Amino acid sequence: MRTAGSISLLIALSILALSAGCAHVPPQEGSRVAGKPDSPRLTLMLARYEENLGNWNDALDLYAEIDDPIAWFAQARIFYIINKPDLALEFIDRLIESDVYVDEALELRTRIYARKGDWNQAIEDTEILVERYPENTQLRMFLANLKIIVSDFTGAQEILRSLLGSGNDSMVLYTLSKACLGNKDLPCAKDQLRRVIELQPRFGPAYLELGRVHELLGEKREAESVYKQYLEIEPDAVEAIVALSDLYISTNRYQDAIDQVQKLRQLSSDPQITRKLVLLQLQEGMFEEALSTITSLQEMSLEDSYYLAIAYAKLDRLDEAFSQLSQINLTSRLGCEAALLRASILKDLGRNDEMMDELLKAWDFFSPKNGCAEVGYQLATELDAAGRREEGLDIATKLLQSNPKDPIALNFVGYIWADEAINLDQAHEMISEALRQRPDDPYILDSMAWVLFRQNRPEEALTYLKRAVEKLDSDPTIHEHMGDVLLSLGKKDKALDHYLKASLLSKNARDELEEKINELVD
């Protein structure tokens, strides 16, 4: 069966044949060459035919033969379609200067400017059209969207509110919610989105936006409820599942997040979803599950090797963990993290000399670049624990040279000075600055207590130690310090309790701690 397009072409060719006359008759002087239509109207018909077929170049060639506003506008339209805006604008300007098809030209020019990102010119043209056609709701909606793009949210709201009741309130309200968000008027945005859902209960984007607004307002339960409502309508709505899982992560509901991410894995083979699940499983201590999830990936990235090493390490499969980490060099983007994990594994294996060598090698690599301060923190701590306190102080001092406000380095130096009862005023200043930056860090709280104790201010020290124990009840040093402070206040029984707890928590209790216990027991 012939198509409509084929029939049109046959008609056009028939007209051409009739116009051309008999083949054996030579053309008259001044007539067009064979194969070229003699009538502008016929040329226009053929040009439109080629345009409808998407034969842009052929259509342009034919339109170019016609010096007429219709052909100018057609060429502008095609140049817009094939993304040649400058050529399109040449014809549009010609139309506007000739005062023909001005409205159509302005509308097309508006779209060209919008595509180019020339929003102000697009707004100017659209405002002219709106003034001419105030009842055209599509133009006014377009203008409102343009104003949102240029952050004229109040102007957009005025236009949109004037459009309510025009027949498409759901989209007007949805766009109005964006203008409200732009003005940081969250209650306004929430109200508009609720009205959208009332009008269009299956309009998914409104649920997603409403959930996000609830989150911005700190209304986590309401956000969860909205996302779940959407999933009741569209159980496989990926964006809603992602939003719900992210909400659970932000509220530390990791198991609930895992459930949602597992649903995502059933809907999508995207490896990033698998990696997200791995991180959640590691967070929740589900190391066997994390191991199984990682190894399901067809292609392993550098990050995957690192996560796999963590899973192995947590399962006490230390040799396998170390083998994975050997694939990650210091020069790679995970060089810092891998070095720290290698050092931790070596320490767990009792290979302390190798652990120290690993940290020293990483420090030598990163410190000239002022990178990976975490290696410096760990190295300083291990040097201090190994009785090489001065070397540890030297590392911390270099960290402070790079960043004088580094809270970890400030705390390290301040604590060492407090422990040695030297430079106490300066130590107090350093620890105070560290605590200002990290007010809930139990180690810094302990350091503040210790410097206050050294300054003979045990009552104040006790306040900080209580906070430190609330934050971290498993650190032996904090409990030993609590015992020292309580003992200085004459509370021997409570002091003994903390000394005993410190001894139980210590892998190798110091002789000094045992002496404190024995003195109180005796």
Which ranges hold each PLM region?
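C-terminal motif of bacterial Sec signal peptides marking the signal peptidase cleavage site
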Residues: 18-21
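Hydrophobic helical h-region of N-terminal Sec-dependent signal peptides
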Residues: 9-15
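Alpha-solenoid helical repeat scaffolds
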Residues: 23-522
